[in-house]
């Protein structure tokens, strides 16, 4: 219960995934299912290059490779639920028959094909089929096997769940959407909030003057200090809406009476398609991120100043041209954090997300002040992953 309650007070993670490991020494020797907010950090731990790897991967099967990721989990709890269901073939999440008619296998199948079969079943199940997930595959043989299985399996996974061929998968594979480009390798995965910093800066700046804000759905005044207000993620759009107003509009337009949470919809201001999970991530970070919001946006302000100075002639004072909007944004930062709880994050908190099996990352983040203590926001890797042998 503590983990669930903690998830409800944190921003939606910048990144969280479940992953499938495979031994590079003997690709038929073992498979490992786990979850993490930081694959580039987690893989070296499994391979013994840094502390904190799971004991079950500390074997002669090293080195391991991450061949498949299931991305898009909105909380650590959600990722752990999916991970557990993927590990356990008799999970209720995968049951196809009526209670009492499904026989439990005496020995679970643990091959690569069996893992892909279980994954395919999970993504069709009522428990997970509506989640905003994507599959990223880094090994060409795994990608080919996944495509074969999707073609022959009963049922199909929902259209919004995309398969992204990456790594050494053939480049003539169908290209993914621009929102989910190829990254080349595990090290290319972006696990921090930098991808939404432009969006975040725009939102904070727009909400700086609440007297001029009106919901694009109900046209009533929006009060960011009292209500949850959403800003359109399109760079050229300045539309804002009440959370409940826009949610109801999106659900109505989906024509799906069983859908409880929107996945996407058309912005009432710019008429462009926008993704609900992205807007919720920005909203949760803006309202729960505390001083980390200031840290990220001040970094961006410095970066913008450097770019502006490099683009202007030497005789033009870059600071004069760029300070005015930044001052207004800085004022918004201060107001945003007046009522934020004093338990805040240091600037590098995203680099120190704890793993439950990472014994070396359990120290409390330190601040420069001896009188002020800060409580670390922790997003852990799982420590109950299942090593599978043939």
From Swiss-Prot:
Zn finger spans (SLX1-type): 215-270
Lineage, top ranks: Eukaryota, Fungi, Dikarya, Ascomycota, Pezizomycotina
Subunit structure: Forms a heterodimer with slx4.
InterPro entries per UniProt: GIY-YIG_endonuc, GIY-YIG_endonuc_sf, Slx1, SLX1_C, SLX1_endonuclease, Znf_RING/FYVE/PHD
GO cellular component: Slx1-Slx4 complex
Entry EC no(s): 3.1.-.-
A single BP term in Gene Ontology: double-strand break repair via homologous recombination
SUPFAM superfamilies referenced in this protein's UniProt entry, alphabetically: GIY-YIG endonuclease
Keyword Nuclease: yes
PANTHER family per record: STRUCTURE-SPECIFIC ENDONUCLEASE SUBUNIT SLX1 (PTHR20208:SF10)
Protein name: Structure-specific endonuclease subunit slx1
Family: Belongs to the SLX1 family.
Coiled coil: none
Annotated region described as Disordered, given as residue ranges: 35-58, 307-326, 357-378
Top-level division of the source organism's lineage: Eukaryota
Record key words, sorted: DNA damage, DNA recombination, DNA repair, Endonuclease, Hydrolase, Metal-binding, Nuclease, Nucleus, Zinc, Zinc-finger
Compositionally skewed regions (Basic and acidic residues) per UniProt: 362-374
A Gene Ontology molecular function term of the record: crossover junction DNA endonuclease activity
Pfam families, A to Z: GIY-YIG, SLX1_C
